[in-house]
Amino acid sequence: MPFTGYELHGMEKIPEGPGLIVYYHGALPMDYCYFICNLYIQTGRLCYSVVDHFFSKLPGIELLFNLLPAVHSGRDESVKILKKGNLLAVSPGGAREAFFSDENYNLLWGNRKGFAQVAIDAKVPIIPLFTQNIREGYRTFGKIGFFRWFYENSRLLLIPMYGGFPVKLRTYVGDPIPYDPNITATELVEKTKIAIEKLRDRHQKLPGSILRALLERFDNHQKED
């Protein structure tokens, strides 16, 4: 991807069978779009995407979701997709993480554990995913108190952002967390969070810097997968 010099590392860690991909949500998840495109080009596999219900209400967006393909109808549908042998991806932080996380790349999952229960019910592994510099390409005004108040009271995805910077993006696939019939959803959430934070701490200099992320376009050095 020439605009961001996008790279994908660790594709071989994605199992051939079904799996639930869990990723950190940037202000604008263009890294995830690049990921699913690369996945299809290199393997011919589609990856279903869990999206916010808000988008299903927008005119014409249903057609796009059918092409992706996307899921916004709940846990049961997600389990069915996985049991059919497909890949499914979700960002537990969702819009809140997109708008209100910052250059420290904190995971904002709250008490969400539905994704973990989906993986348990479908008996599939969880594959952690993290993209270096995704927070530097686009940023939001989420630190301004009014916008946090507006979102929490309306749930409308209308928080302004700025950016479009051609920063270096590298997506890293972590080691799958295998299905364990004896684990609880709460425990699996914690294991997944730790796995993504390890990817972040290994591949992302904190706090993030737009200038540094731009300069990394000219730096061929990268941390090992």
Model-derived features: positions:
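Helix-to-loop junction immediately C-terminal to a conserved catalytic motif
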Residues: 1-25
